[in-house]
Amino acid sequence: MTELKNDRYLRALLKQPVDYTPVWMMRQAGRYLPEYRATRAQAGDFMALCKNAELASEVTLQPLRRFPLDAAILFSDILTIPDAMGLGLRFAAGEGPVFERPITCKADVDKIGIPDPEGELQYVMNAVRQIRKDLQGEVPLIGFSGSPWTLATYMVEGGSSKAFTKIKKMMYSEPTVLHALLDKLADSVISYLNAQIKAGAQAVMVFDTWGGVLTPRDYQQFSLQYMHKIVDGLIRENEGRRVPVTLFTKNGGMWLEQIAATGCDAVGLDWTINIADAKARVGDKVALQGNMDPSILYAPAPRIREEVASILAGFGQGGTGHVFNLGHGIHLDVPPENAGVFVEAVHELSKPYHP
């Protein structure tokens, strides 16, 4: 495999010295870029884009051509696993993902199997291999999955939800059914992420987008324990390097200590927590990723730079162990030049923190 020309992202995740704070953006390959919209139109639809290795690689690399980002992230979707389980995923205009055959009972859970990463999900592994080849060692490639809880919300609700009534009804009235589903999903995520690592992903991330809708007790039982199982099951060394794992629970700031105790290398932060507080609480155990509000990218350049400076100052001296990112995905109508201001500001303004 090609030697990495820029390994700052991996080094920061392992709390090793870097000369500036590395940065990437969640959803950095996406609709805010006109070139992405053109490639998606060429593919026909979103899943066709995901399933074409050359086009998936093209959109993964597009933001790196515009901005000096320190990592690439696989272009894919968190719903690939439930799709491969046969739930009939489609993306409906104006309403997001919809599953034609949602999980409603124990029989539905019993029916689904653990997808073969080099079978039903081989298109994802082909994309990882293609991206690694096309990156030519410029920056590391991040693989990812949704968390078992977050995947289960879509599978039980039948799509996106605001109130999560169906899955919470299952959680409170038939917890053994939900645990059986979550256990299958955890095994599927372990298999899927390990296959991504073998195919060339140099770090992995688990997105627990909906963990923050749970009570503290339910978060431990229905989300965190399954992410802990995933961390325990992952390949942690490959190609002679540590493969860092980042866990990100949106609205999970109250549970940082418990997340850090899973054995992950880094914890993702959304914008609702002060990074100085997060560092004081868990910075001795894990690296931190985050955590600018994506909406700041609508602001004029001086305001973007001011926010970057504030977050860097919050993390403070001894600045290794911080990967700068947004607190969630970049919004689709952000001007690309504002994303450029953000990335350049992180590099420029972080250098004094890395003497």
From Swiss-Prot:
SUPFAM superfamilies: UROD/MetE-like
Major site of localization recorded for this protein: cytoplasm
Enzyme Commission code: 4.1.1.37
Transition state stabilizer (site feature) positions: D77
GO molecular function, one term: uroporphyrinogen decarboxylase activity
Pfam family, one: URO-D
Residues annotated for substrate binding in this entry: R27, Q28, A29, G30, R31, F46, D77, Y154, T209, H328
Keyword Calcium attached: no
GO cellular component assignments: cytosol
Cellular compartment(s): Cytoplasm
Highest taxon above the source species: Bacteria
Gene Ontology BP term (one): heme biosynthetic process
Keywords assigned: Cytoplasm, Decarboxylase, Lyase, Porphyrin biosynthesis
Pathway: Porphyrin-containing compound metabolism; protoporphyrin-IX biosynthesis; coproporphyrinogen-III from 5-aminolevulinate: step 4/4
Catalysed reactions, as listed in the record: uroporphyrinogen III + 4 H(+) = coproporphyrinogen III + 4 CO2
Family to which this protein belongs: Belongs to the uroporphyrinogen decarboxylase family.
Subunit architecture: Homodimer.
Free-text function comment from the UniProt entry: Catalyzes the decarboxylation of four acetate groups of uroporphyrinogen-III to yield coproporphyrinogen-III.
Name of the featured protein: Uroporphyrinogen decarboxylase
Organism the protein comes from: Vibrio cholerae serotype O1 (strain ATCC 39315 / El Tor Inaba N16961)
Gene of this entry: hemE
